[in-house]
Structure formats: C-alpha cells, structure tokens
C-alpha cells in the first residue's frame, strides 16, 4: 500500500488551489470562453425546457450573490431564501442550475489543462476513423480470439456522494469550493442517499447533467487509476532495480526447470507468476477485463479488486458484481451487441493422390448478434409495439403530416440497420423492420380513419418497402463469410461502419423517455 501512496502522490502534483476565488470573479465568462465554450451560445437546461442560459448569466448570478443585500436577505429571512425557496420555481430550479453549471465549468479547467499538457508531451496521433464506435469491434475480434477468460465488472458500485467529493481532494486543495460542491449535493433531499444503480445515477444527472457527469468521470478515473496501478505491479516491464530484475530472471529459470520435472502441475500454475495479456474495455456502467490467464489467476485479480477498492474507496465492494467466466462458454452484452467467442468444428476434406480423408478442425470465431428481447422492449417502451412484439399505432404522431410520419419511422429503421450492421444474423433486424413498418401503416391508417388493408391498397406496399430499404453509401469495413455452401449469404455479412460516433437511442435504454 505504501507503493500505491507514493504512486498516487505523483498524480497529485497538479493540484489547484484557486478554484473558489476563480469562481467568484467578475469575468468568469471569459475563462469559460477560453476554456473552449461559446459564451454567447445558450445551453439547454434539462428540466427547464423553456429557459436557456449561458455563462454570462452565471457571471450575473455570481455578482448578485456577491452583493451584500442578497446575503442579508437570506439571513434575515431564512425561510424565504431566494436560492432555496422551492415555492418559487424560477429561483429554486433556474438559479441552482446555472450556478452549479458554472461551478462545473470552473472545476473542469484544471483537469482540462492537465490533459492538454499530457497530450502535448506524449504527442498522441489522432485518427478520425478511430472515433467510430464500430472501430472497437475489429479490435475485439483480433484480440479476444487468443484470450481464455473474461470478467464482467459493474461500475459504479453503491457509493455515497461524499466519497465523490473526497476524490476531488486529490486534485483540488480548496476547502471553500468543496463546501460549495456539498451545497449542490445537499440541495435535493434524495441526493444524500446511496447511488445503487446506473439508472438512478442517470436520473440525478438529468437534474444537473454537467456537474454529475464531471463527478462520475472523476470517480471512474480514480477507479481506473488504481486498476492501472495493479496491472503495472503485476508486470516486470516498469521495474528499474537491477537486483529485483535479476531475482525475477532467476525465479523464471527455476520455474522453467520445475516445469521440466513436473509438466502437468507446471502447466496449471505457471500463469499465476507470468505476466498475462490483459485488455480492459469500459462501456457506460460496465467494464470488461479479458485475459489469457487461467480462471485461478482471474480469481486472484478479483480478490485484488475487492480488497484494494475496499481500502481505497472506504466502502464494501460486492464480490458478486465481478463475474468470472471462460470466454468460450459465455457471452457478454457490449454496446448493443451480444458478443461471444464460440469454438466451431470445421470438417475439411483432404485428398492426397488416391487417398482422401477428412480432418476435423476446431476454430474460434468472434460472433456478434443482435439481442431481440432488449430491442423489442425498447420499441415497446417507445410505444411502437406491445411487450410481446405485436405492432401498434403511435397516436402521438397522428397530428403530423404523412411524409413526416414516414420520415420518422424510416429514419428509426435505417438507424437500427446502420448501427447493427455488424450482426452475423439479420433475422432479428428483419423482425424489427416488420414491427416498425406495420406500426407506421397502422399510425397512418388511424390518422386517415381507415383500415390497414385499405390504406396499403391505396398507398401501395412497394413505396414503403423502397423507403425502408434505402441505405446511405459510406466507407466501411466488410467482413464477409466465405462459405460456399451458405444459402443465406446476406444474413451473415458483417459490416462495420466508420461514421458512427454515438450509440443508438434504442440500444441505450437509459436515454429513453
């Protein structure tokens, strides 16, 4: 633990002590503009659809709070606080929103400066194509075929909001600003409760999106920080002491000699001491930790994560939130795809001169399919179908024009096909297409007060079919199944597009209203 404390001290060298004085400066909007924001561009407040604000309003509110009369009225009339008076929706919601947003902007400045200096020192090259979400799937296909086990980690754990404030003390040594942050966290009564799931945390973020997004990112940053520390400690590459390095070499030679004498036992225990090949991928509130080591090594890593996070985060980490599975016997839900690495048996016929024989070859394949149940549930929540997948009309859209209704349904269908184009099986997509097409027809029939059959005969199903199958031509990577005996080649083609920069709303159920 002393090594970790020394390792973490290096990361605290850029602590800032000027956040609170900077917050109450008159020209805070200038700092926000230099930070990369547009001071004149209004930012929409979630929960206040009719009100917008900019950093200039933040400056005016801070100047008004800095005046003596504002605080005198707050002291003389504590039950009628202009900022905390819930009876006045404008003061209780609008002022608290813009003040907390301004606080989040100022606190982000030292973190952005640190990231900027780090990127300038490392000179990290930027590739536009790697910004696509689909670019990670070819990486997983290339790496996961050689791995053996996988761990599913749920982030965040149940954590008190006070611990989130304590995380900022590593970077910001400013007591007034931390007290101001506690003021925002205590503004709503339910903010003092534990965060028990990613959904509840997202609901809190909807009240104050920028501030809680900053707190969540700081929490994940600290979590990945000690995870990186554990990974570096398990590797001999960063060792600088020659004596320790020689001891490691002698130990490896002894293990090699031991493996010659006891090959069976050595094969089971060697991966505990050797450096594993590990890959870490995080997606929203989940993380995937894949390794080439055995299941026993993954259990050791699980023990490290539980014990170390219990000491560092000062709370009990539930071991059941870290699931260990063999990669060939399990599947994982990642970014709207159900991915797995099954072992397929391929029968090959080999002929040499007059003799012919068959060879059975076992091969790993990275398979990605579209889960039907979550997507049908998302369509049901959006009122396109029932819970069992039966298409229904959408009465909310009956006031729109026919072209707007067709355009909305068609855009949803094209986005689904575009995002899930990497699926090796397209049957689920065709089922979703059928649900959306029939829901569109029933919506139009309800608008014109006719039956679906009459409306389809009058409009024609050919127009709807051409409308839904219209696809935009983009540069893509194609991975085509080269099997000569496939009668459904179009169902197995996998296409990864390089222009997808955001997750589909139906894939992420947290974004559905």
Swiss-Prot record:
One of its GO terms (cellular component) is chloroplast. One of its GO terms (molecular function) is RNA binding. Its main location: plastid. One of its GO terms (biological process) is tRNA processing. Keywords: Chloroplast, mRNA processing, Plastid, RNA-binding, tRNA processing. The keyword Chloroplast applies. The keyword Plastid applies. It is found in: Plastid, Chloroplast. It holds the Pfam family MatK_N. HAMAP family: MatK. Belongs to the intron maturase 2 family. MatK subfamily. Usually encoded in the trnK tRNA gene intron. Probably assists in splicing its own and other chloroplast group II introns. This is Maturase K. The gene is matK.
């Amino acid at each position: 633990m002393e090594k970790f404390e020394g390792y973490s001290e290096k990361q605290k060298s850029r602590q800032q002590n000027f956040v609170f004085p900077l917050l109450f400066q008159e020209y805070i909007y200038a700092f926000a503009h230099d930070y990369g924001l547009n001071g004149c561009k209004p930012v929409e407040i979630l929960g206040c659809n009719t009100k917008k604000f900019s950093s200039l309003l933040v400056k005016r509110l801070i100047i008004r709070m800095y005046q003596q009369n504002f605080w005198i009225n707050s002291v003389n009339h504590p039950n009628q606080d202009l900022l905390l008076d819930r009876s006045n929706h404008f003061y209780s919601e609008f002022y608290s929103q813009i003040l907390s947003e301004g606080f989040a902007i100022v606190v982000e400045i030292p973190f952005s400066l640190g990231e900027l200096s780090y990127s300038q020192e490392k000179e990290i090259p930027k590739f536009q194509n790697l910004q696509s979400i689909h670019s990670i799937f070819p990486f997983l296909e290339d790496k996961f075929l050689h791995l053996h086990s996988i761990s599913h980690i749920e982030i965040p754990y149940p954590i008190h909001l006070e611990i989130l404030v304590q995380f900022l003390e590593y970077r910001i040594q400013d007591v007034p600003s931390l007290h101001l942050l506690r003021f925002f966290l205590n503004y709503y009564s339910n903010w003092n409760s534990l965060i028990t799931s990613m959904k509840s945390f997202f609901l809190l973020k909807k009240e104050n999106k920028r501030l809680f997004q900053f707190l969540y990112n700081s929490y994940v940053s600290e979590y990945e920080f000690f995870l990186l520390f554990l990974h570096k400690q398990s590797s001999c590459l960063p060792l600088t002491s020659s004596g320790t390095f020689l001891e490691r070499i002698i130990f490896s030679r002894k293990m090699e000699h031991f493996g010659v004498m006891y090959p069976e036992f050595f094969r089971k225990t060697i991966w505990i001491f050797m450096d594993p090949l590990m890959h870490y991928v995080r997606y929203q509130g989940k993380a995937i930790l894949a390794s080439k080591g055995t299941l026993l090594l993954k259990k050791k890593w699980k023990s490290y994560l539980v014990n170390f996070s219990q000491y560092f985060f000062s709370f009990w980490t539930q071991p059941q939130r870290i699931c260990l599975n063999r990669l060939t016997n399990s599947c994982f839900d990642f970014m709207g795809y159900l991915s797995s690495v099954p072992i397929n048996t391929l029968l090959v016929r080999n002929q040499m001169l007059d003799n012919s024989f068959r060879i059975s070859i076992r091969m790993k394949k990275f398979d990605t399919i579209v889960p039907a149940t979550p997507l049908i549930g998302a369509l049901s929540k959006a009122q396109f179908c029932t819970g069992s997948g039966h298409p229904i009309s959408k009465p909310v859209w009956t006031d729109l024009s026919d072209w707007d209704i067709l355009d909305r349904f068609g855009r949803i269908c094209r986005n689904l096909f575009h995002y899930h184009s990497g699926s090796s099986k397209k049957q689920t997509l065709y089922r979703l297409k059928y649900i959306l097409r029939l829901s569109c027809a029933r919506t139009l029939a309800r608008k014109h007060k006719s039956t679906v059959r009459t409306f389809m005969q009058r409009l024609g199903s050919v127009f709807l079919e051409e409308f839904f199958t219209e696809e935009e031509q983009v540069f893509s990577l194609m991975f085509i199944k080269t099997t000569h005996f496939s009668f459904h080649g179009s169902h197995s083609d996998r296409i990864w597009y390089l222009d997808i920069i955001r997750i589909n709303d139906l894939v992420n159920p947290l974004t559905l209203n």
